[in-house]
Amino acid sequence: RLYAINPKHATIQDQPAYKSIEEIGARVEMAVIATRPQTVPQLIEQCGRSGVRNVIIITAGFSEAGHIGAALERKVLEIARSYNVRILGPNCLGIIRPELGLNATFAKITAKAGNLALVSQSGAMCSAVLDWAKANDVGFSSVISIGMTADVDFGEILDYLIYDSRTHYILMYVEGIRNARRFMSALRSAARIKPIILLKAGRHEAGAMATATHSGMAAVSDTVFDAAVRRAGVVRVQNVGQLFYAAKALASKFRPLGNRLAIITNGGGPGAMAADRAGDLGIPLAQLTNETMAVLNKAMPTNWSHANPIDIGGDATPERYRDAIMAVTHDANVDSTLVMLSPQVMTDPLAVAKAIIEVADKLNRSLICCWMGEEQVREARQVLEDAGIPAFRMPETAIELFHHISKYYRNQKLLLQVPSPGRQAAGGRPGSGRVLVDALIAERRRVLSRMEAHALLHTYGVPVRPSMVAHTATEAMFVAEQIGLPVDVHLESPDLADAFDEQT
């Protein structure tokens, strides 16, 4: 049920309005605040007294607005925490959960149900994605605009989405991070389970200044951020268009096994453009095996390109496209196939699309399509997309999309990599570490002392702070002078280790 609250009006859109949330007299699960910033603290107080534990603050004018706004934000958080109230925002669009029929935003349009989750710091970006999604028939499990992340942040949202059965893929728009440790921990955990596509603003100085003004957060080094999210297994895109197309691909059946690409085309020019963009992005074109070449030589006209890109001629029929696809899908050197079509005089774009759909489920490789043009190929593109096969207008777009999605699966493999047992860090002596561990095992020890732990780390080249053992206060003073002040003092005793062992 929805309750309207406004002290100045008796009704709002023909619904009765209450002067305060305390007048409702029924349990309220969530409140949405869209009033002047100065009124927010007292409204949070009222929510707390009424037992409301979840609040969305759409209102702007807090930490992003300077010192006065930041002080107001701190006051809001202090009151909220005293009542155990959680806050999404402030300065956010709100949240949409299509499956629940929940639209707690001021967006003009809502989202259809689907398996994509969108998490964004920018409400304007959410509105743009929603508009694009409606035109492209893309659905969402959740659309979450988190705004200034004064309380609930990226980390907690990601932790929730990991276990949300309706969410299969996650799209993120990021401007700044308040808690880097929590963000990276949640990001890494989520990316192990669900594909994450991330767009971050502020890559350059002007953009960083703009995001700092908008989000009220200090910019971080883009190089450091990029390396961190890549190691977490996340795919980072560079612009809004790539985010849209990645969303489109994730909602389809496209699952590349690797990044070795075969290109099938009915025109040399489009094939060359696709190959060039692949080269820009470091995507290797698959080297076709002798067996594949023999099959193609038998099935294609004599003037086919005899190389990858596989130009099958401007008069290519649906059957010729099908034969070319079937030939490369059994090639061990091919991970995925890009099928391109230019609407030439002898081409039937719709018939070719239908032929591809007929064999798509029989393939052991993923397909992505590029039907170039507009009027003559519009229906064919839609037919492909309805069948779960991504279809694009331009070869560069298709290649970029393939790059980002294949990079996700490649990043997942990196997450599983561990250093080999024989790998030795600079300055390390792994053999000495093995001797130490064997000695401890022989003593039936389960806990290392601090000095033993430091010694073990040192043998593997891991930097540790210098440590020394002192048996008396005088020795401790002497050791401290040797190490240099200030120093940390810890008790070193096997009895303490045994006690800890028993407790655990």
What is the predicted role of each segment?
Residues 1-504:
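Catalytic-core regions of core metabolic enzymes
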